[in-house]
Regions:
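Short acidic donor-binding/metal-coordinating loop in glycosyltransferase active sites
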Residues: 173
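PAPS-dependent sulfotransferase catalytic domain
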Residues: 1-170
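PAPS-dependent sulfotransferases, especially Golgi type II membrane carbohydrate sulfotransferases
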Residues: 1-23, 131-148, 155-166, 176-184, ...
């Protein structure tokens, strides 16, 4: 079994009641949530912040298991480009070479109660198209210089859960997708959370669908050079993604 990227277990005797998944768009967050919901007694929650955002909440309870799921940066870029989510219209229509080089902006998508369920109070009269502040730089408030800086900062934020005195496990989407029981084994063996003896595995896609707009298979040498120049390569290596 492949080891997880990281584990934080702060209270050996803790009884867990719930779990929340964090991870960037197109990284398998819905897959991980469905797997845990079907195979553990834990309640899935989203009240401790937007799962695609940087974790920030007054208190993270010890009774919650936080799960962070990551994805290979190249596969993630291709998936995000193929089906962008909450991305400003001017960006989602760009050719790939411009998509990875332009300043990033995300837009607010109204939901009946979704944002409130994430722990936020919002004016629900706001329409689609308002700036999504959770996808701006968390300190400087500016747009990210490009989607690669967005990944660097938000990945660092997700990994910070390992240092926030939380019960947390960080896994790679590739490992869980190849062997779904990988995550369940960690949950059982490390956190002593009961799982089904015979795991219920997912047979179809989970999560909301979105229009597939663009597809890209091969990256140009110039695009790869740009990606390597702007990604935090040390952080990617820590996560098991050498470039």
């Amino acid at each position: 079994m492949t080891d997880p990227v990281g584990v934080s277990r702060i209270s050996p005797e803790q009884v867990f009641k719930m779990f929340q998944v964090f991870g960037e768009r197109r990284s398998g967050t819905n897959f991980a949530s469905a797997l845990l919901s079907k195979n553990t007694p834990l309640k899935e929650v989203s009240q401790f912040g937007w799962k695609h955002g940087i974790p920030s909440f007054p208190v993270f309870p010890k009774s919650c298991l936080f799960v962070v799921i990551l994805r290979d940066p190249i596969d993630w870029l291709k998936a995000l480009y193929r089906a962008p989510f909450e991305v400003a219209p001017g960006i989602q229509d760009l050719p790939f070479r411009e998509f990875i080089r332009c300043e990033w902006e995300s837009v607010y998508t109204p939901r009946k109660s979704g944002w409130r369920g994430h722990g936020y109070e919002l004016d629900f009269s706001l329409g689609r198209g308002e700036i999504l502040q959770l996808d701006r730089h968390p300190v400087e408030g500016r747009r990210y210089r490009n989607v690669l800086e967005l990944r660097n900062v938000k990945l660092a934020g997700h990994l910070s859960l390992l240092s926030r005195s939380t019960n947390c496990v960080v896994v790679r989407y590739e490992d869980v997708n190849r062997d779904p029981e990988h995550l369940l084994s960690v949950v059982r063996d490390v956190f002593r959370i009961p799982v089904r003896d015979k795991a219920l595995l997912l047979k179809q896609r989970v999560g909301p669908s979105s229009p597939k707009q663009n597809a890209i298979t091969d990256l140009s040498a110039a695009d790869m050079e740009h990606i390597k120049k702007h990604l935090d390569l040390a952080q990617e290596l820590r996560c098991g993604y050498p470039l």
